[in-house]
Protein backbone atom coordinates (compact mmCIF):
# COMPACT_ATOMS: atom_id res chain seq x y z
CA UNK A 1 0.00 0.00 0.00
CA UNK A 2 1.37 3.41 -0.99
CA UNK A 3 2.26 5.91 1.70
CA UNK A 4 -0.26 8.75 1.91
CA UNK A 5 0.67 12.43 2.29
CA UNK A 6 -1.77 14.98 3.74
CA UNK A 7 -1.56 18.44 2.17
CA UNK A 8 -3.22 21.19 4.22
CA UNK A 9 -4.31 24.03 1.97
CA UNK A 10 -6.35 27.22 1.76
CA UNK A 11 -6.82 29.94 -0.84
CA UNK A 12 -3.84 32.00 -2.01
CA UNK A 13 -1.31 29.17 -1.77
CA UNK A 14 1.86 29.60 -3.83
CA UNK A 15 0.91 27.50 -6.85
CA UNK A 16 4.31 25.96 -7.64
CA UNK A 17 4.90 25.14 -3.95
CA UNK A 18 1.89 22.85 -4.16
CA UNK A 19 2.13 21.47 -7.68
CA UNK A 20 5.86 20.70 -7.77
CA UNK A 21 6.14 18.70 -4.50
CA UNK A 22 2.77 17.03 -5.13
CA UNK A 23 3.96 15.89 -8.55
CA UNK A 24 7.32 14.72 -7.16
CA UNK A 25 5.57 12.69 -4.47
CA UNK A 26 3.05 11.16 -6.87
CA UNK A 27 5.77 10.36 -9.44
CA UNK A 28 7.63 8.51 -6.66
CA UNK A 29 4.52 6.39 -6.02
CA UNK A 30 3.04 8.18 -3.02
CA UNK A 31 -0.62 9.11 -2.67
CA UNK A 32 -1.62 12.69 -1.80
CA UNK A 33 -4.82 14.13 -0.35
CA UNK A 34 -5.68 17.80 -0.06
CA UNK A 35 -7.23 18.78 3.26
CA UNK A 36 -9.06 22.08 3.66
CA UNK A 37 -12.08 23.69 5.25
CA UNK A 38 -14.71 21.96 3.10
CA UNK A 39 -14.51 18.73 1.08
CA UNK A 40 -15.19 19.09 -2.66
CA UNK A 41 -14.64 22.86 -2.36
CA UNK A 42 -12.20 24.50 -4.74
CA UNK A 43 -9.27 26.51 -3.41
CA UNK A 44 -7.40 28.89 -5.69
CA UNK A 45 -3.69 29.67 -5.69
CA UNK A 46 -2.12 33.11 -5.97
CA UNK A 47 -1.54 32.56 -9.69
CA UNK A 48 -4.87 30.88 -10.51
CA UNK A 49 -4.17 27.17 -9.91
CA UNK A 50 -7.43 25.52 -8.83
CA UNK A 51 -7.44 22.49 -6.55
CA UNK A 52 -10.36 20.57 -5.10
CA UNK A 53 -10.24 19.70 -1.41
CA UNK A 54 -10.41 15.92 -0.94
CA UNK A 55 -11.10 15.80 2.80
CA UNK A 56 -12.40 18.46 5.19
CA UNK A 57 -10.26 19.31 8.20
CA UNK A 58 -13.24 18.28 10.36
CA UNK A 59 -13.11 14.75 8.92
CA UNK A 60 -9.33 14.39 8.51
CA UNK A 61 -7.58 12.03 10.89
CA UNK A 62 -3.82 12.63 11.04
CA UNK A 63 -3.11 9.01 11.97
CA UNK A 64 -4.35 8.02 8.48
CA UNK A 65 -1.35 9.76 6.86
CA UNK A 66 2.34 8.96 6.59
CA UNK A 67 3.46 12.57 6.11
CA UNK A 68 2.26 16.18 6.04
CA UNK A 69 3.00 18.82 3.36
CA UNK A 70 2.40 22.54 3.99
CA UNK A 71 2.87 24.72 0.87
CA UNK A 72 3.55 28.44 1.24
CA UNK A 73 1.99 31.57 -0.14
CA UNK A 74 -0.75 33.15 1.96
CA UNK A 75 -2.43 29.79 2.60
CA UNK A 76 -0.59 29.27 5.93
CA UNK A 77 -1.95 32.60 7.21
CA UNK A 78 -5.49 31.45 6.40
CA UNK A 79 -4.85 28.05 8.01
CA UNK A 80 -3.55 29.72 11.18
CA UNK A 81 -6.64 31.95 11.20
CA UNK A 82 -8.90 28.95 11.80
CA UNK A 83 -10.80 29.95 14.95
CA UNK A 84 -10.71 26.42 16.36
CA UNK A 85 -6.98 25.95 15.69
CA UNK A 86 -7.67 22.72 13.80
CA UNK A 87 -4.73 22.98 11.40
CA UNK A 88 -2.18 23.55 14.16
CA UNK A 89 -3.66 20.62 16.07
CA UNK A 90 -3.53 18.47 12.93
CA UNK A 91 0.12 19.42 12.30
CA UNK A 92 1.02 18.81 15.96
CA UNK A 93 0.22 15.11 15.53
CA UNK A 94 3.03 14.88 12.94
CA UNK A 95 5.62 16.92 14.84
CA UNK A 96 4.88 15.28 18.20
CA UNK A 97 4.99 11.73 16.81
CA UNK A 98 8.05 12.20 14.55
CA UNK A 99 5.97 11.68 11.40
CA UNK A 100 7.55 13.31 8.29
CA UNK A 101 6.51 16.95 8.07
CA UNK A 102 7.35 19.08 5.02
CA UNK A 103 6.94 22.88 4.82
CA UNK A 104 8.17 25.50 2.37
CA UNK A 105 8.22 29.31 2.27
CA UNK A 106 5.45 30.54 4.65
CA UNK A 107 4.43 26.93 5.40
CA UNK A 108 6.61 26.63 8.53
CA UNK A 109 4.38 29.28 10.17
CA UNK A 110 1.76 26.57 10.73
CA UNK A 111 4.39 24.66 12.73
CA UNK A 112 4.58 27.59 15.17
CA UNK A 113 1.09 26.57 16.30
CA UNK A 114 2.34 23.09 17.25
CA UNK A 115 4.57 24.45 20.03
CA UNK A 116 7.12 21.82 18.93
CA UNK A 117 9.78 24.01 17.29
CA UNK A 118 11.96 24.64 20.35
CA UNK A 119 15.48 23.47 19.54
CA UNK A 120 14.59 22.38 16.01
CA UNK A 121 16.66 23.62 13.05
CA UNK A 122 14.48 24.87 10.20
CA UNK A 123 14.26 27.45 7.44
CA UNK A 124 11.56 29.47 5.71
CA UNK A 125 11.15 32.58 3.62
CA UNK A 126 12.96 35.55 5.16
CA UNK A 127 9.85 37.34 6.45
CA UNK A 128 8.76 34.40 8.67
CA UNK A 129 12.15 33.67 10.21
CA UNK A 130 11.68 35.98 13.21
CA UNK A 131 8.40 34.21 14.07
CA UNK A 132 10.12 30.82 13.79
CA UNK A 133 12.98 32.02 15.98
CA UNK A 134 10.53 33.40 18.55
CA UNK A 135 8.94 29.93 18.64
CA UNK A 136 12.30 28.54 19.73
CA UNK A 137 13.61 27.24 16.42
CA UNK A 138 17.21 27.56 15.27
CA UNK A 139 16.59 29.28 11.92
CA UNK A 140 19.14 28.96 9.11
CA UNK A 141 19.31 30.35 5.58
CA UNK A 142 19.74 27.18 3.49
CA UNK A 143 17.85 25.82 0.49
CA UNK A 144 16.65 22.78 2.41
CA UNK A 145 16.97 21.77 6.04
CA UNK A 146 16.32 18.28 7.40
CA UNK A 147 15.92 18.04 11.18
CA UNK A 148 14.81 14.50 12.00
CA UNK A 149 11.23 14.31 10.69
CA UNK A 150 10.92 17.97 9.62
CA UNK A 151 12.03 19.10 6.14
CA UNK A 152 11.82 22.82 5.34
CA UNK A 153 12.77 25.10 2.44
CA UNK A 154 12.70 28.83 1.76
CA UNK A 155 11.33 29.70 -1.70
CA UNK A 156 10.31 28.22 -5.07
CA UNK A 157 13.94 28.31 -6.26
CA UNK A 158 14.64 25.64 -3.61
CA UNK A 159 12.03 23.19 -4.90
CA UNK A 160 14.49 20.78 -6.54
CA UNK A 161 16.32 20.33 -3.23
CA UNK A 162 13.07 20.25 -1.24
CA UNK A 163 11.46 17.66 -3.52
CA UNK A 164 14.55 15.46 -3.42
CA UNK A 165 14.62 15.46 0.38
CA UNK A 166 10.89 14.87 0.93
CA UNK A 167 10.90 11.89 -1.44
CA UNK A 168 14.06 10.55 0.21
CA UNK A 169 12.45 10.92 3.65
CA UNK A 170 9.40 8.88 2.59
CA UNK A 171 11.49 6.24 0.84
CA UNK A 172 13.54 5.65 4.02
Curated annotation (Swiss-Prot):
<dbReference type="Pfam" id="PF01965">
    <property type="entry name" value="DJ-1_PfpI"/>
</dbReference>
<dbReference type="InterPro" id="IPR002818">
    <property type="entry name" value="DJ-1/PfpI"/>
</dbReference>
<dbReference type="InterPro" id="IPR029062">
    <property type="entry name" value="Class_I_gatase-like"/>
</dbReference>
<comment type="similarity">
    <text>Belongs to the peptidase C56 family.</text>
</comment>
<protein>
    <recommendedName>
        <fullName>Uncharacterized protein SERP1413</fullName>
    </recommendedName>
</protein>
<feature type="domain" description="PfpI endopeptidase">
    <location>
        <begin position="3"/>
        <end position="171"/>
    </location>
</feature>
<dbReference type="InterPro" id="IPR006286">
    <property type="entry name" value="C56_PfpI-like"/>
</dbReference>
Amino acid sequence: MAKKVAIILADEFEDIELTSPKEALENAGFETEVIGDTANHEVVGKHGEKVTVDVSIADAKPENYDALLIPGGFSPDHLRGDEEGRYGTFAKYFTKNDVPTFAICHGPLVLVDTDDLKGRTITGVINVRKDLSNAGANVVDESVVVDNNIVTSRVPDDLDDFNREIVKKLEA
